[in-house]
Amino acid sequence: MKLHSATCIATLAAIATITSNAQAQTAPAPAPASAEVKPVEPYTITGNFGIYSQYIFRGLTQTDRKPAFQGGFDLATPGGFYAGTWGSNISWLHDAGVVDHGASLEWDFYGGYKYAFNDDWGMDVGVLQYWYPGDYLEGVTKPNTTELYIAGNWKWVSLKYSHAVSNTFGIPDSHNSWYLDLSANYPLTETWTLNTHVGRQEYKGQTNGFNNGDNLNYTDWKVGVTYAAAGGWNFGAYYTDSTAKDAGYTLAGRNIGKATGTAFVQKTF
């Protein structure tokens, strides 16, 4: 009897152990502490405003080397789509003598799509409308211009092709003119960036039987530096030059594509 009792006790102990282990293995794990889930913003809005010693566009001064006040806003979605607007004072249309009054403003509107393949490679496609409000002389081709563009970037280097689907900056019969922009913004330090650029403007079509490109095609280049300060402030300066011909780019007695320097201060927010 004692032998049987010991055996039974051992058997019951084994069963209890197995049951306890089984319950431990099948019991649900304690729920992890819930992590705070931040909602994804449907879009972001950023802005910028700057004061420049002059406005240079594709190697050409747009303000006859006088100061320019510039600013804009951009809206971007998490999916890569974006839209924005930007403006600056100008003087080149008055200098060209093609307006009665007005035309002292360039107002741009644009939208497109950006995609990042990885941390190094990306692309950008979109449309850009240049608008120059004003009262123009009769028979003048208005400078309002629409361009489609596509760009690719690798780290700090970008290559952008812009194709005009309208007349280009007031030149008659200039549809399909284009501009190619190769730029590199190399970070020297966490706050200093070296800015370089070379571009090529090609005009298509004819005016009064002469090819537009004969006097209007040119190459431009730029080199400069930018300092990123605290609070979204940027300070910089750059040197620009071009091969713009006197016959095509002399306004108010001066070639607007000659070598010049520009300084600026900009605030982003």
Predicted regions and their residues:
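Outer-membrane beta-barrel biogenesis signature
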Residues: 22-47, 56-69, 224, 248
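Residues that define the transmembrane beta-barrel architecture of outer-membrane proteins
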Residues: 43, 65-69, 103-107, 142-148, ...
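Transmembrane beta-strands of outer-membrane beta-barrel pores
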Residues: 51-57, 87-91, 115, 129-133, ...
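Surface-exposed loop and membrane-interface regions of Gram-negative outer-membrane beta-barrel proteins
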Residues: 61, 81-142, 209, 215, ...
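Structural signature of outer-membrane beta-barrel channels/translocons
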Residues: 74-80, 114-116, 151-157, 185-187, ...
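Repeated loop/turn-to-beta-strand initiation elements of outer-membrane beta-barrel proteins
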Residues: 79-85, 119-125, 156-161, 190-196, ...
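Detector for outer-membrane/organellar transmembrane beta-barrel domains
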Residues: 143-213, 239-240
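Outer-membrane beta-barrel "beta-signal"
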Residues: 223, 227-233, 254-269
